[in-house]
């Protein structure tokens, strides 16, 4: 699963969403469930051996019964419901980074968001803003102010480039209200309202 770019594609644990083993997910995560699959396969192999049959069946029974019981447990209790709106511009990849398309692309997302302002959170795709963050400040300020006025938060992906260090980052930034009690628009360039992706992936956003 690590052959493509080092990212865990199609890990074994994802295959157990409907099985009793998924009950272990809140405790050991997807990687732990992958390990349990290997253990389970070993146990099933040992079942065919007369000397290890009884022990293998007992351990397998305990493993899957434990998973089933854990799956019945409610691990989190929702405290509040939040409404989320998502905008997908479906911009063709061939036009994504064409400078002449910057304006039309950003206009598309602005228009798509007009019907979403009443949500608690609005989500734009990873490269919704096709300009480097330092060059997109007027547009980001506009979205930031509007989101604040509408009492909501908007998160979007954008590429940031540091001219001093010659480093580029694919960032997730927050515009508008990061917290409900914020007294002013949250976004500032190079503020801590961002998360920089640590691993780039060869995937597109066109649906």
Regions found by a protein language model. Give the residues of each.
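Membrane-embedded alpha-helical bundles of multi-pass enzymes
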Residues: 1-73, 114
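Soluble catalytic domains of enzymes that build or remodel membrane lipids, polysaccharides, and related
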Residues: 72-207
């Amino acid at each position: 699963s690590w052959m493509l770019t080092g990212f865990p594609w199609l890990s074994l644990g994802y295959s157990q969403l409907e099985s009793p083993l998924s009950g272990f997910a809140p405790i050991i995560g997807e990687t732990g469930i992958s390990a349990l699959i290997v253990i389970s396969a070993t146990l099933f192999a040992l079942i065919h051996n007369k000397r290890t049959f009884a022990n293998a069946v007992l351990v397998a029974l305990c493993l899957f019964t434990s998973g089933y019981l854990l799956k019945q447990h409610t691990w989190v209790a929702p405290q509040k419901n939040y409404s989320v709106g998502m905008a997908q511009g479906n911009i063709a990849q061939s036009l994504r980074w064409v400078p002449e398309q910057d304006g039309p692309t950003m206009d598309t997302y602005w228009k798509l968001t007009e019907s979403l302002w009443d949500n608690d959170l609005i989500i734009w795709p990873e490269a919704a803003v096709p300009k480097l963050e330092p060059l997109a400040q007027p547009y980001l300020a506009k979205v930031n102010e509007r989101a604040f006025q509408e009492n909501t938060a908007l998160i979007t992906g954008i590429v940031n480039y540091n001219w001093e260090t010659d480093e580029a980052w694919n960032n997730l930034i927050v515009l508008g209200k990061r917290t409900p009690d914020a007294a002013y628009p949250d976004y500032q360039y190079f503020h801590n309202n961002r998360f920089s992706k640590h691993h780039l992936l060869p995937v597109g956003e066109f649906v």
